Amino acid sequence: MSDNTLKKELKLTNLISMAAGGMIAAWMVEIKFWFELSGPGAVVSLITCALLVLPLCLIYSELTSTLPYAGGENIWVSNAFGWNAGWFSCWGVMLLYIMAMPTVAYGIASMVGFLYPITFFQTKLIAAIILVIWFFLTNKELKILAKMQSIMFWSTLVVSITASIIFMTNHQWSYDNLTPWFPNGFAGYGAAVGLLIMKFVGFDLIPQLSEESNFPKKKLWIAFVGSLFLTVLIYGLAVIGVGGIVSTEWIAETDIVDPRVADIIGMHWLGVIIVIMGSLTCLTTLSSFWLCASRTLYGAAKQRQFTPIFTALNKEGQPWKANIVVGILSMYFTVFAPEAWINYIYTIYGAAAGVVYLLVTLSFLKLRKTKPNWERPYKVKAAMLMGIISIIFTLWVIYSSVVAMDMGAWIVLGLYLLLGIPFWVYAKSKQKTDPEKWGAIILSPDNQK
């Protein structure tokens, strides 16, 4: 494309389904970890986490409407604290997206195992094939993917809620089975509130896609709040539905929860439907993270934080060169990820997300003071209060994640951070040797249409 700009093709409903689809992945696989943290009380932890994420969503809504550029957090942090701080926030956001995709692919493969038992190697092979197929799809016109995701997400919403209602109305469901609500006490509840932030990483996909939206920016808050509500609804009902039938100990020993519970109540057909729709939901998650990872690179390249070749768009309006890099990184993590990957990712995710969200909150407060005249189609009420709540919450997320990280998680996180340093050094050196092509740029209303 000659103008090198992204197409504006996304409706409000598209953004809601893509953001919620990014949050709602293979819950029937990951729910084991939720029960391990806080038992049936995980539903309370999820609701608490969502309520604490809400101020952050409103902050994101204002910043997205003010600076609606692909790159999201990077652009905001760059405007508040400079090009270097923006670069490192960009690298942190990339970690969230890249590490999530293999996990989603594994989720699909694990659900396939419900229909036919497969080995860990076969799981990796299936996950790798899924990533290859999705690479080609992400280079197609965005509105095609958006329509596919909308159909898959809204269908899964209906199936998941229906399944949970069936569980709760079955004669084997008992409220007594939900007790004790918090087998690990307040410590388990608090840890879950901090670590389950991973299940809400998805609302932050909206800023990456906002440049391609075709509706008034003042309505962006609906996408944030709507996707958050739908996520809590599905997760909360799932916990109550299965928790009233099986024990926490049983959940810890099984491979995939909801379909196995369907078998227990004599509804194998329901388990098959859950697996099929769960797999489709994983595809929406995979697609959302992939699209946003490529647009993160696209936005960073426009600020000369990465090579300008990442701004190249194909005839469908997709950043195809950025898609190649995302595909390579995703494939690498998929092929070399150990079986304990799901144990690493919650803590690494929490630490990375906490730092990124803290930087975003601080940027929000600073830009309110330093750029008061910028047009804000959506403006947060009680800005200082929302900022303080978000700061306290993000610090708790960071703390909960760091204390739960084992040596394997620290090694993975450390290697990722070290991997980024050469890219940052290269960009800084090119600013000196080739300032015409690499001169630092910070996208803002002052220099963008």
Please state what every model-predicted region is:
Residues 48, 348, 352-353, 365-366, ...:
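A generic transmembrane alpha-helix motif of multi-pass inner-membrane proteins
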Residues 1-41, 45, 53-58, 69-70, ...:
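Membrane-interface "cap" regions at the ends of multi-pass membrane proteins
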Residues 26-118, 122-123, 227-231, 409-419:
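Extracellular loop-to-transmembrane helix junctions
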Residues 75-76, 82, 114-118, 225-289, ...:
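TM-loop-TM module centered on a large, flexible mid-protein loop between adjacent transmembrane helices
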Residues 42-43, 117-122, 150-276:
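Helix-loop-helix junctions that connect adjacent transmembrane segments
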